[in-house]
């Protein structure tokens, strides 16, 4: 009987810890939404809140017009663990901070360790944006042997034309696979579809109309609320992420 009680207490404690972690991760997602980062989109996996799907759209610099998919893997005890989240690109990406073999992004130069309550995922994504906007500036003051791809760094400093050509090759290859069948059945995986006039045309027209004319406020907005886009957390529910 005592053993059963102890086991139940352990199960309850584990459940409570899991729920607390889920809400902390939900808070991180809400912060990302509020920051409105341009050209970068992420969403937690439906099946596992420690795995996030993301897409980066280059808007300036050498990586303009790039569309790079990536995955974020959070440590098991995130955000209380000092271990850093892992960002892995799903294709070849030449960059001094990206390992050419694992496609992993080194964020340790900006985040030596994860500080719970001080470091947040939106800052991590902002760092990703910054180093792709200006890769040369991102390696200033860092020794070549401390970079994940020292050859890329050297090429960037000595032969920018060749570096840009390599970047363009990456961009071309990534776009060739943008409409590929998703590698997972997870419903939160970010999927792109080719434009279909009958499906997407009406939506495009509504977007254009919205730019030229202010739409009438919804009932929710009229009552002091605000409209939101599609979310993986259903409106009116408090169940976040993968809690069943």
Curated annotation (Swiss-Prot):
InterPro entries, alphabetized: UBQ-conjugat_E2_core, UBQ-conjugating_enzyme/RWD
Superkingdom: Eukaryota
One biological process term in Gene Ontology: defense response to bacterium
Listed transmembrane segments: none
Domain UBC core: 20-176
Region feature (Disordered): 209-244
Family per record: Belongs to the ubiquitin-conjugating enzyme family. FTS subfamily.
Name the record gives this protein: Protein crossbronx
């Amino acid at each position: 009987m005592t053993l059963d009680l102890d086991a139940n207490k352990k199960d309850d404690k584990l459940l409570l810890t899991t729920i607390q972690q889920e809400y902390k991760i939900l808070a991180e997602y809400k912060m990302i939404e509020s920051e409105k980062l341009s050209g970068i989109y992420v969403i937690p996996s439906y099946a596992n809140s420690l795995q996030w799907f993301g897409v980066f759209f280059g808007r300036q610099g050498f990586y303009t017009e790039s569309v790079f998919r990536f995955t974020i893997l959070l440590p098991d005890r995130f955000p209380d663990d000092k271990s850093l989240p892992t960002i892995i690109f799903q294709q070849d990406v030449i960059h001094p901070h990206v390992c050419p073999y694992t496609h992993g992004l080194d964020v340790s130069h900006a985040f030596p360790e994860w500080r719970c309550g001080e470091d947040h995922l939106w800052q991590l994504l902002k760092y990703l944006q910054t180093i792709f906007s200006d890769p040369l500036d991102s390696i200033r003051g860092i020794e070549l042997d401390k970079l994940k791809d020292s050859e890329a760094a050297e090429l960037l400093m000595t032969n920018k034309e060749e570096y840009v050509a390599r970047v363009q090759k990456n961009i071309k290859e990534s776009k060739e696979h943008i409409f590929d069948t998703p590698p997972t059945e997870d419903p939160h995986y970010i999927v792109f579809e080719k434009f279909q006039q009958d499906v997407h045309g009406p939506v495009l027209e509504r977007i254009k109309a919205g730019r030229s004319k202010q739409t009438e406020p919804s009932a929710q907005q009229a009552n002091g609320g605000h409209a939101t886009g599609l979310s993986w957390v259903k409106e009116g529910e408090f169940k976040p992420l993968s809690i069943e």
